[in-house]
């Protein structure tokens, strides 16, 4: 019976809708994560509205949205607070600990422990990292309100500084992180010193066995005290600077002084052009300072004065007093010249000699994300002006010594156009897609998950020899007819003569620990290939004979070899195209000016030497 045209059309429409639905379900991000150059639709990201001179806020938030380690920290920190429960972070510290805190009010301390700004920033960055189909603009008002409530003040919109806003946000995040760490430590101490809680003593050592191929394995011991190691990752913006003073006369080195930082301020020299490394040299290079009164030199001067007074002392009491003071000063010189001396009268500080000192500065703890502020302010009698020097900055920044060198990758910058008192901020952020939004191999990931195990069994599974068929004709006398087969791999080659199975062949080997741990997929795939070695040998012999005797078979073999060569060439070409596509994706940047967004390249970003104001570098992981 002939079907109606309407029925055929309905069937076709239903099949098309089903195909579209399958593509939408199983590959939702394929059009997003694939090669954007192939599509006509222009991709973009979420912009921020600017109702009242909010460009300094928008530029910093867009730059923070492009930092993967920051987003990872926010997710981990909030998830940890949810797992611990609100009761840990609602508990206030004791009076002794509260006196040492910078914040004294109980409600402020509780907000720090709860991480209010951490949660608000995560929600803000999650919204900025969406991939909209069409142009989308949101407001940062919710985050600004949370920040204003945390500081109990209003953020003015009258030409504010982006670096000041970044400093406020970063310091607040750092304070919330350290408050959460102290709250967790306080909760652990309360559990340890709880006399009413019965705890079972866990063994300090656990005996395990490592798989080394033998039957019983290799005995080993794991120390459970490794679990006590603190697994704190730290705030990604926080690093430590160490400064040390050395006297150039007596060569005494003061105790190093460590300070924490959430961003580094580098002074831009007053010249037409410079480099970022030159700005770092201004911070980390050795600085020489004159007219400094060294503590050790002051003690040496005191010994000299006391010794002269001892020579001129007339009474025994004065002589004993001076000898005791000289002894104390000598003890202080050998132990610690910086500590104050009790019971010793030193000469006036104005009489102490002035020395030349060297001040060394270095970064001892590198942050995961280093935020660099290029200070372009110049002050004179008439007022302040902007330093418009060109600062060349690299895409990969090396920091540290030769033995402990760290490499950082540029992820975002904030630029300022205008004068010192007015202008506009815009940001550049690298076009990165972080999980769970990034699925560049939607369809290949399933095929890769079905791949066989990389560790096959060392010993083949025991199986009985296959019986030969009596009706099988000989293969043109090229190889003797295989009457029986063995488990040896030699029976799979057509050139090897078959032999009767021996008792050793029929004996099944004893499986070891490692050989029994084989995935189901590898066993299943290997069983398909080794079901019948006898039939495989007969088929191989007959196929090789047919190929040798038939010219058509030889031509078809040549065609197959040519097609295999073409397949390999196409595979290598596709691999090269994927590499080029990956390089092209890494070269993409977003140029964001409030709600206006457009794409640019790395060369465009590195060319913003006159306008660059803030730089965000992320430390490179090993193997990246």
From Swiss-Prot:
Residues 518-544 have a biased composition (Polar residues). One of its GO terms (cellular component) is nucleus. Pfam families: UCH. It comes from the Eukaryota. Keywords: Hydrolase, Protease, Thiol protease, Ubl conjugation pathway. One of its GO terms (molecular function) is cysteine-type deubiquitinase activity. The keyword DNA repair does not apply. Residues 46-620 form the USP domain. InterPro entries: Papain-like_cys_pep_sf, Peptidase_C19, Peptidase_C19_UCH, USP_CS, USP_dom. This is Ubiquitin carboxyl-terminal hydrolase 16. The gene is ubp16.
